[in-house]
Design a protein with these regions (language model features):
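Short, glycine-rich nucleotide/cofactor-binding loops
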Residues: 4-16
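A short, charged/proline- and glycine-enriched loop
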Residues: 1-3, 62-63
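C-terminal accessory extensions appended to soluble enzyme cores
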Residues: 49, 55, 133, 137-189
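Short, surface-exposed basic-aromatic patches at helix termini and helix-loop junctions that form
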Residues: 23-26, 79-81, 103-112
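Structured adenosyl-cofactor binding patch, chiefly the S-adenosyl-L-methionine
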Residues: 103-152
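S-adenosyl-L-methionine/SAH cofactor-binding core of RNA-modifying enzymes
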Residues: 29-97
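Histidine-anchored nucleotide/phosphate-binding helix
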Residues: 13-28
Length: 189
């Protein structure tokens, strides 16, 4: 069974991060999720997975794959046998992308790792995990349905655009209901 590791790279633990990590936990199971690099807020996240305060680059692991959009190879179902750990940068992406995964995560490992990409478009962390889980379970990237960009209605006459790539589940973009409710209630988006 694969372990999915989210290296928290945001300056603090935002409410939307907690919602996203909870969504990931529901998808892959608490026993298969690690959240690393958390200085504060780790107690709240323990119900969703294993929480490690230090960076994943300080945890000695083998059979590691870092998901990096700049990786030269795409993740394939055959990689499921090669890797035990799939590591994701928990970063709120910018549009256009700032290419933070390499300098803030991939380049910091002192032990051997391999990198893979899941396409050239930026995804939310929960969507990236869902895509990797599908590929590890036998689907090729090319077989997965996606939608680029979504608009979420907040209230009458007000909406928010997310320019990221979303996996389609039952024909709809994979977005946590809890996140949508949070965005609708949040002031000052």
């Amino acid at each position: 069974m694969s372990t999915y590791i989210i290296e928290h790279l945001e300056p603090k633990l935002w409410k939307w991060c907690i919602i996203e990590y909870k969504h990931i936990s529901h998808m892959v199971g608490k026993q298969n999720l690690w959240i690393t690099n958390l200085k504060k807020g780790s107690k709240e996240l323990q119900k969703y997975g294993k929480v490690i305060k230090m960076s994943v680059v300080q945890v000695p692991l083998s059979k590691v794959c870092v998901l990096d959009p700049d990786a030269h190879k795409m993740l394939t179902p055959a990689d499921a046998k090669k890797f035990d750990y799939f590591i994701f940068g928990g970063i709120l992406g910018n549009d256009p992308p700032q290419k933070r995964t390499g300098p803030e995560l991939t380049s910091l490992f002192t032990y051997p790792i391999e990198t893979r990409n899941i396409g050239s478009k930026q995804m939310s962390t929960d969507n990236a995990v869902a895509v990797v889980q599908k590929i590890v379970n036998g689907k090729r990237f090319e077989q997965l349905p996606f939608q680029d960009g979504i608009e979420i209605d907040l209230k009458e006459g007000e909406s928010i655009m997310f320019p990221y790539r979303y996996l389609l589940k039952d024909g709809k973009p994979l977005v946590s209901e809890e996140l949508m409710e949070y965005l609708k209630k949040k002031k000052g988006i």
